[in-house]
Amino acid sequence: MRKSGWGYDFETRERFVNVLAKRATWRVRPYAPSDETEILALCTKIFGSTSTLKEWRWRHLENPVGEALVFVAEERDSGKLIGHAAAVPIDFKVGDFTRKGFFVVDSAVDQVYRGKGISAVLTVAISKESCKRDGGFGCGLPNEQAYFSTLKTGAIRLFTMSLFVRVLDWPGLLRARLRSAFLAKATGGLIRLFQRRKQPRSHPRFIIEEVGRFGSPVDDLWQRSASRFPIAAIRTATTLNWRYFECPGSPYRAFSISTDGNWQGYIVIRRVQKWGLKLGTVVDLFVDPDCAQAGELLLYHADATFRADGVDAVWGLFSAPERYRKLLRDAGFFKIPKLKAVRPFHFVAEFVTVDHLRPDLAARDGALLRQEDQWFLSLGDTDLA
């Protein structure tokens, strides 16, 4: 857990931001509906984003948990939009209570205006507004370029999410990296000999079905299982439908597994084309902790679905208890080690404002929130899938 710099003291940070704002030729303000076109143009310019206005409104305005916090930076004289930050709300179960987190999905400053403190002021604006919303806090998965600057404004690294990969077509994967098709096929066949896994035993009492909408069965599953997850994004039919089925052009497929009419778990998957490969993504996997076989069967079903689609490899991103990690290992996934070429997925959170203004919440939840092994987070809880 990294903690250093001016951003970790509330009053020092406030003085810094106030002085900066008074001297600046720009200002930060809450978003207005007329800003949407400029926000999209800025994100396209900086990130190459292809998001449409419909997608932007779905993510920022239609979330059943609440509207996103959106701030913009503009030139004082011209009104030109030069920066933007947004965070979408997530209801977290934290122990026996509910806390609102605000996951930063966009943070962008025009290259011409970088180094002037705009990003810091936008971040603090989100922090202060988060606290006003039921004692909320900001969080996110900053990329490598933004990670250290995020820490300087008061965030701390809570944990690093684990990247799990399972290769389905070794010859195909190697062919994308090797010029020789013969060598790729031979090497891939040899690797497969050492990576055969045992098919999980099916059981007639388990029924796997594709889900077109989530309903009361997933609410019942969450109510039965929630106590086993100290910290997790609350999973309800309403939020899951918004996340996976109501997004424009939804690319997701979901499958449930049940016994005697009761859901024991679900899995959400999608397929993407990248680096000349067909990649399958385990976006979300949630199972009753007392029914490990349900998780095994869901992963095997996803495996078969991906194979039928010609997928080369499958990946997922989790911060999860050991029982989940074992489930993935048994299904043939391996955890990617720390490598220079692989981006680390550091999950950060900022508690400076809420700890200062709501010491009651800091006393109640602060220690638990900072315990890495108490969190359950999947790729679907982030903005990466």
Where are the regions that the model predicts?
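Active-site-proximal structural scaffolding
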Residues: S49, G66, S119, C131, ...
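Extended, charge-rich helix/loop segments that form flexible
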Residues: R177-L221
